[in-house]
Amino acid sequence: MRVKITLACTETGDRNYITTKNKRTNPDRLELKKYSPRLKKYTLHRETK
């Protein structure tokens, strides 16, 4: 079952990305390095509720 999740920047708190994940294979929170337009660099983005 795939669900939509929002990824928020850990440095600015901006919610920059929306993606999907499979809850069965990835039950924990997703963390990805993505581009932050405000900081103009790649930062860690975490899954929000």
Swiss-Prot record:
First and last residue of the signal peptide: none
Gene Ontology BP terms: translation
What is an example of a GO molecular function annotated in this UniProt entry? structural constituent of ribosome
- What keywords sit in the KW lines? Ribonucleoprotein, Ribosomal protein
Q: Which Gene3D superfamilies match?
A: Ribosomal protein L33
* Native source species: Bacillus pumilus (strain SAFR-032)
Q: Which SUPFAM superfamilies match?
A: Zn-binding ribosomal proteins
Tell me the gene name: rpmG3
Please provide one cellular component term from the Gene Ontology annotations of this protein. Answer: ribosome
Q: Which NCBIfam families match?
A: PRK00504.1, PRK00595.1, rpmG_bact
User: Could you identify this protein by its name?
Assistant: Large ribosomal subunit protein bL33C
Family statement drawn from the similarity comment of this UniProt entry: Belongs to the bacterial ribosomal protein bL33 family.
InterPro entries to which the protein is assigned, alphabetical: Ribosomal_bL33 (IPR001705), Ribosomal_bL33_CS (IPR018264), Ribosomal_bL33_sf (IPR038584), Ribosomal_zn-bd (IPR011332)
